[in-house]
Every structure is written in C-alpha cells, then in structure tokens.
Amino acid sequence: MSEIFDNYKGLYELRKMSFSDLDKFAQEIRNFLINKISKTGGHLASNLGVVELTLALYKVFDLDKDKIVWDVGHQTYVHKILTGRADRFDNLRQFGGMSGFPKRCESKYDFFETGHSSTSISAALGMARARDLKNEKCNVVAVIGDGALTGGMAIEALNDVGDKKTNLIVILNDNQMSIGKNVGGVSTYLSRIRIDPKYNKFKADFNDVLRKTNIGTGVADSLSKLKSGIKQMLVPGMFFEEMGIKYLGPIDGHNIKELTEVINTAKNLNGPVLIHTITQKGKGYKFAEKDPNRFHGIGAFNLDTGKVSKISGDTYSKAFGDAIVELAEEDKRIVAITAAMRDGTGLKKFSEKYPKRFFDVGIAEQHAVTLAAGMAQSGLKPIFAVYSTFLQRAYDQVIHDVCHQNLPVVFAIDRAGIVGSDGETHQGVFDLSFLNHMPNMTIMCPKSLHEVKYMLKWAANQNSPVAIRYPRGGDSIELSAKTDYIVGKWEVLKTEGNIALIATGKMVATAIKVQEKMKAMGVNITVINACFVKPIDKSIIKKLVSKNYKIITLEDNVLSGGFGESVLQYANSLITTNSINSESKVVNLGFDDKFIPHGSVDILYKANNLDVDGVVKNIVKIL
C-alpha cells in the first residue's frame, strides 16, 4: 500500500510532512521506481540512492524561487515524481514519452538540462551570479556525484566558486561510483574522509571549547593555527576548505532528518558551502545493492530475480573487447585507456588480463586523449575506447595533441549513430563531422562486428591517428567480413544498374536491404561499403561520375560536415573543373541539423527516414 505516494499532491506538501512520513514516503517511492523500471528499463541504481536526499532538499527549498541543478541528470527520477510526473513513467525514455534526464520543456522545475557529467557546479554558479547581478533573493544548489567530481570541469568550477565567494550550495552525493567503481586521486581523497571521522569530531569539539572558554586574542590565534595543523594531519589537504568552500560532512545521505538539519545550516551560511553526503547506489533493492554497476542503466528485468528480460547477443563492444585482448597478446606495446567506462566499452577482460597496461582515468576525456598522445610519442600503441558522445568533450585535445603531431593513437568510438533511449545528449551523430576535418586523421567504420578485429589490427599498425567508429548493439543481418584494408579503398558489394548507394558502417546493412527491395521493384542498384570515411575512395567516385551514376550516400551522422558532404564535394569538383563531362547527381542521406530525441533505435531511424522504407522513398524521388 502506498498511502502517502497515492495522495501526494505537490511540493508544498513536503514542507509540512513529518520525518516519519517522509521515511515512509521514501520507501514508497523506491517501490514505485523498482516496479516501473523493471518494465521500461532505465537508470535504477542511481535513483534508488538519492531518494532521501531529494526529499530533504525539496523539504528545505522552495522550487518556485530556489533552483537546483542535478549533475548528469540520470538520477532525477525522484525529482520527476515530486514535481508531478509520476503518471508518465509508463512511457519513460520511449519515443514521445518522458525523458530520463532533466528537460526544460517538461517542467518549470527542470532548471538546467544535463546528460554529460561535471557541468552542474558551473551552471549553478552562473545562475547564482545572475541572481546577484539582478539583486534577486534565492538559493542555488548543485548536486554532483563523486564520480562527476573527477571531471576537470567540476574542479575548475570549484576553483572559481571558492575564489569569488559566491553564495552557492554544492551537494556532493558520494556513492563511490560513477557508472563503475571510481578511480583516481579525488576518489581516494574522499575515501579517506569517509572512513576517518576524526576531523569532524575534532572540529565540533574544538569550536565548542572556544565558545565556552574566555581566552585572549593571541591565544585564540595560536589555537586556530594549531587547529589548522591538526586538521591537515587528520584529513590531508582539506581540499574544499583550502579552496575557500565551507565543508560540512560527511553525513548519512539516507537520514532525512540529519540531511534537513545540515541543509538548513548551509542555507544560512554566507559564501559557498559543500555538503558531503554518503549514499548507497541501488539502496532498497538487493540485486541493485549487490551489483550497482549492472543496474546503473538496465533494460526491463524480472523483479524477483533481477535478471534482464531480453538477453542481447554479440555486440560491437564485446567484439572490440575480444579483439584488443588478442592484439595485446601479440604486441606488448598495446595499452588501453578508458574514461570511467571500462565495462561499457568492453575493456573488462583486458583490464583483468593486463592490469598494468590498462588505464582508467575517471571522467576525464580531455586528459585521456593527451595521455594517449604522450604514450604514443614514447613508443607505445594506445587505444582509447570511448563513447561517441563523450569524445566530443576532448575535441581540442584530438586536434592539438594528437592530429597536429600526427601521433599514432587509435580511437575506438563506441555508441556511434543512434543509441536510443538516452536521447539528445547521448546520440552519437556528430563524430564523423568533427573528426572529418582534422588533418592526419583516418576514419574507419566496420559494416559487421566481425570486422572490428581486422580494423583494429590495421589501425594499430599505422603511424598516424585512426578512429574506428561502431554502433551500440550488434548486427541486424550477417555480412561477410572484409579482412584486409588499404587506406582509402572501398568495397563494392553489388554491381547493378546506374544508381550507386554508398553506405558506411551500420548503414551498409540497410543499403543491402534497400538493394533487395528495389530489385523486387525492378530497379537495380550498386551497393558500395565505404569502410573508410576518410580518406574517401576518389577512384570509385571518379568512375561513378564518369559513367553518369546517380550517387546516394547513406550515413548515421548529421549531414553537415559528414561523410556524404565529402563525396558531394569531390564529385562536384570533378564536374565544375571540367575534369569530367557528367550528368551525375549526388544525394546525401543522414540526420538533419537537429538534436535527435529519445526513443527506440528502430523508431528513431524510421522517424528520420533512414530505415529501409525511408531510403527507398528517397531513391524513388530521384529516379
């Protein structure tokens, strides 16, 4: 029975609830989340860990005037329930349904949209400074996890916060996890605070003595210096306070009464304050508590067993993971780098077999790329496995530190193209465009997961940067693997008719299906696998143009700056410079200049006319 949950009317009720009722409400919210996400899938473990914290925040703050920014945003399901969206969970992350992240168009209480990590403090600080310049009165809060705190942007923001003394509250949600287990110096530092409460007890007792003792100024100054020295011994660095940020904690992130008291204290302090809360990712569901990594983002699952309802087959991530282990056996110079995504990118097996050659840098893509550059300069063969959407964060480093020096770094780009339910902030539809204009960069796309190992071996033997991009999941049809590669040379799969469909990566399977459907309609098509996006195969394009082919390019990337534009530009140059007298026409198919929302992969390709039927319709238009 969910008496409080079922009768909940809005945020104003939280401020009137007793702590015992809030504790009951927390359990009812957990039951609701476990039940709903078991059917739809979603980010379960992170949301189960912030139930009490969210309730405490919304009991203290008035969201009609105060502002709260949630870092990453995948832990905002409780926020969505409390702000009136519980009835939309049946369509969570589905096309046309509720987003799994904050969306300003969904609610006035979604103050800032997030998806990538480490942005909340910067955004909240911007809001706080806007408040001050406009002479407004409100509280601004950033909620950030210990994983996100490993991101350089978060540290940059803290540095700015402490320097300018802006009134801002930062809640550190410390669950010792990002998606997987946290790594690095920041994580180690926080661990020392968690397990050693001596400083916090000392600070409270010391301040109490000073308040009760009548002493002179000189003695007080000496004692303050003594206090400073002792706290350095007890908690080395006192990282936050030395940056000029008042530190409160660590406190139990599942004790609503204690949370409320500390938040109220922070609310009444001048200058920036950081509240350090300790939470358990997956709390309240035994399977998520035992394996929070698996329940970070999970598909529909069985409530009683915790097992995923639909077991996926072979994936590109697994193919990459197997391939890099095999490659590392042959070449001791191979090293693997990830930015807090070991399991997601398929590197678990490598990390266990070659722990000294595996480097998880935390949520620090910029650092990861330049680390790889340094390794390459020193004779190693670094392979950086990263999701397409997160490689965006290291754009400058790829250009400045890798391509500019023409260093042999391999980028294994996972989750390229449409990833589905995570939505706009996670779709991998920009990488071809931002990599395509980088000098010295070679870009490859396997048409089948069996090609990953051959591409990876080829890439690792080059003396310049190579990016291999591949989609989430596996293959829709079985295609024979191309096993040998010559830079810039494509693969002709079908030679029929005077229409050439040139596809890259995952879209080759779509092209094959289109060819079969068009043939049944009496139209013959030549299908070409553009296994190299950069450089393009100029000899094939020149041949097609000289024979007046209608050329159609097909990619799972935005059209602007993408693969198709490279083909179009070269084909046009052949015609406009009078190199070839041709009536060829080039049509580019890909994603338009817009952000792609959440939904299933199949539905999103269909909605953008990049499924088989959509491509066929586009071909018919130019016949």
From Swiss-Prot:
- Residues noted as binding Mg(2+) in the record, renumbered to the chain: D146, N175
**Residues that bind thiamine diphosphate, according to the entry?**
H74, G115, H116, S117, G147, A148, N175, Y285, E365
List the NCBIfam families.
Answer: dxs (TIGR00204), PRK05444.2-2 (NF003933)
Record-listed E.C. numbers:
2.2.1.7
Species source reads Clostridium novyi (strain NT)
Q: Which SMART domains does this one have?
A: Transket_pyr
Q: Which GO terms describe its molecular function?
A: 1-deoxy-D-xylulose-5-phosphate synthase activity; magnesium ion binding; thiamine pyrophosphate binding
Pathway, according to UniProt? Metabolic intermediate biosynthesis; 1-deoxy-D-xylulose 5-phosphate biosynthesis; 1-deoxy-D-xylulose 5-phosphate from D-glyceraldehyde 3-phosphate and pyruvate: step 1/1
UniProt subunit comment: Homodimer.
Free-text remark on how the cofactor is bound? Binds 1 Mg(2+) ion per subunit.
**Listed transmembrane segments:** none
Keyword Transferase assigned = yes
Q: What is this protein called?
A: 1-deoxy-D-xylulose-5-phosphate synthase
Similarity annotation? Belongs to the transketolase family. DXPS subfamily.
Q: What class of enzyme is it?
A: transferase
> Which BP terms does GO give this entry?
1-deoxy-D-xylulose 5-phosphate biosynthetic process; isopentenyl diphosphate biosynthetic process, methylerythritol 4-phosphate pathway; terpenoid biosynthetic process; thiamine biosynthetic process
Q: Which UniProt keywords apply?
A: Isoprene biosynthesis, Magnesium, Metal-binding, Thiamine biosynthesis, Thiamine pyrophosphate, Transferase
Essential cofactor(s): Mg(2+); thiamine diphosphate
Matching Gene3D superfamilies, A to Z? Answer: 3.40.50.920, 3.40.50.970
Per the record, what are the reactions this protein catalyses? D-glyceraldehyde 3-phosphate + pyruvate + H(+) = 1-deoxy-D-xylulose 5-phosphate + CO2
